[in-house]
Amino acid sequence: MYNVEYLPLAVQDMVEIVVYIARNLYNPAAAEHIADQLAETGESLRDFPYVQPAYTPLRPLKHEYRKLLVENYMMLYWVSETEKRVTIARVVYARRNYTKLLE
């Protein structure tokens, strides 16, 4: 079993997603639903961190990222086998060009 860690940017991303859906789209029920889905998906990585293949970018990155679709959002994470840890780096709108956000 792996520990799951959220980087501050990932937490900020998730808060912004939930607030946007609740306030801008006037749909607090949908906001609560996506918050639950994001939390459940993050926790599922404890047991199945390799559920998705590694993301192959055009340029070299510091980490071997994996991406997991959660409704309309992409959860970007990497796995540290030595530390038995999954680090969730970002959560972004799936149609966004997220390659610029990764290091």
Annotate each language-model stretch with its function.
Residues 1-37:
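Arg/Lys-rich, positively charged N-terminal/basic patches that mediate binding to nucleic acids
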Residues 5, 33-43, 62-69:
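PIN-domain endoribonuclease scaffold, especially VapC-family toxins
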Residues 25, 29-32, 36, 53, ...:
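Residue-level detector of alpha-helical recognition elements and their boundaries
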Residues 25, 70-74, 78-103:
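Enriched for short, Lys/Arg-rich terminal
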Residues 42-53:
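Short, solvent-exposed helix-to-loop capping segments enriched in aromatics
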Residues 51-82:
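Basic/aromatic recognition patch in beta-strand/loop cores that engages polyanionic ligands
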